[in-house]
């Protein structure tokens, strides 16, 4: 068992995701894949590095995901700028041989795990994303001694859908954690009126990854407006939710 493969409720924060992330770089593309094994939620993201500072991209991505464990190839640490960023997470690093980061092997691994002939039904994944995702699930299966837990199909997060905030700015904004490391003096603590663990994790994820996609922003605002205009229904639903167990983690 590693920090990123814990699933025991008594060892996890009920309102925070326990994220393990994998990084894979191919040419000018950074592939990210992350998983919360306690819920089965599984994501990938492709980030273009063309005309961008790779160290800044890496820093902002890791700060956004706040992983408890990071899978990275040994060759990735040879870049001094990237090494300095990853060194901030040194206690969370699991370094793997570069030879394991093969996109074709990763693709086949994903097809075997999800029992599909092609990944096209799940989305249009880049080679970098596929590599990161395949490495991640292979690592999880190895740590679980071949007993792969329930994992949702991979969801692609598009680069221009969420705001990228560098690590220093995110820290100063005190979104999820204050400058002193206190979780009780943050934007999340002010906003969090959730009554379930599932809702708490969802809110924390949304605060950490602000949307920049206008249609999705308006969709969320429409839902907020509806419940603001129907206070009795809102309170009735809150009362019902209070008795709901953490189904995400129970099912996983």
Where are these regions (language model features)?
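Charged catalytic and DNA/RNA-contacting regions of genome-maintenance
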Residues: 1-226, 239-242, 246-249
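Amphipathic, charged alpha-helical scaffolds that flank and support histidine-based chemistry
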Residues: 228-237
